[in-house]
Design a protein with these regions (language model features):
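Conserved ABC transporter NBD signature motif
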Residues: 56-70
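Conserved ABC ATPase signature
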Residues: 143-147, 151
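A short, proline-enriched helix->beta-strand linker immediately N-terminal to the Walker B motif
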Residues: 162-166
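Catalytic Walker B motif of ABC-type/P-loop ATPase nucleotide-binding domains
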Residues: 168-171
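A short, surface-exposed alpha-helical micro-motif characterized by mixed small hydrophobic
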Residues: 209-211
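C-terminal boundary and immediately downstream tail of ABC-type ATPase nucleotide-binding domains
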Residues: 231-255
Length: 255
């Protein structure tokens, strides 16, 4: 469904992503983990066309989301054309990114009305279904400032789902939350996985990675160190010292 082919990214001459190849199948949950500064979030932003790679290509269902071909040459898509791909690849950020001056319901119907060109009544009905799905139908008239971080993130997930994406990207969706609020967001994400939503998740929540991930991709210094199913990645037989060090650090920090 999604293929990253020899993706590279440089900032100010420094290469932060080094020829990364990843494929994601329909219905798969791929969890990307690694130390801070390893390139995880940059990778997600490139999948959503918020950052342009310095090299390589990204294919969604066999079609490039970066370039179009004309007369045998590749040309970048316009910003308007890129916006169409972004409706197919939803993204949930760690900072929620809700419109502060709009109610919960207004936040969710904004995209469907203005991008999907839905009628307002139909968008509202869909939004209510999604709010019930994330357990927040009773908050439809509330404003973001009155909600907890966990509630705001669940609204952000509902807003992303309202665009009917083919897959969802999560960029450390629980890292900005108080520990007691993390669980409510992870429950929503687990339910999406059970429903077959294709997801790429950057997270430090190892319990989620172990339980829900179909594959764990460990990135360090812009390079994929390992791409393996969780039963191998977390097993004591995994001999990769860099991964052991990373997991041990997480364990110590959690104490």
């Amino acid at each position: 469904m999604l293929q990253l082919a020899s993706i590279k990214k440089s900032f100010s001459g420094k290469e932060v992503i080094k020829e990364v190849d990843i494929s994601v199948n329909k219905g798969e949950v791929v969890v990307i983990i690694g130390p801070s500064g390893s390139g995880k979030s940059t990778l997600l932003r490139m999948i959503n066309a918020l950052e342009y790679p310095s090299g390589g290509d990204i294919l969604l269902e066999g079609n490039s989301i970066l370039f179009k071909e004309s007369k045998g040459k590749k040309h970048p898509y316009s910003e308007k054309e890129l916006s169409r791909f972004r409706t197919e690849i939803g993204m949930v950020f760690q900072g929620f990114h809700l419109f502060a001056h709009k109610t919960v319901l207004e936040n969710i119907i904004e995209g469907p009305i203005h991008v999907r060109k839905m009628k307002k009544e139909a968008a509202i009905e869909e939004a209510k279904v999604l709010l019930e799905k994330v357990g927040l139908l009773d908050k439809q008239d509330a404003y973001p400032h009155s909600l907890s971080g966990g509630q705001q993130q669940r609204i952000a997930i509902a807003r992303a789902l309202a665009m009917k994406p083919k897959m969802l990207l999560f960029d450390e969706p629980t890292s900005a939350l108080d520990p007691e609020l993390v669980g409510e967001v992870l429950v929503v994400m687990k339910n999406l996985a059970l429903e077959g939503m294709t997801m790429v998740v950057v997270t430090h929540e190892m319990g989620f990675a172990r339980e829900v991930g179909d594959r764990i991709v460990f990135i360090d210094q812009g390079v994929i160190v390992q791409d393996a199913p969780p039963q191998h990645f977390f097993h004591s037989s995994n001999k990769n010292e860099r991964i052991h060090k990373f997991l041990n650090t997480l364990t110590r920090n959690a104490v």
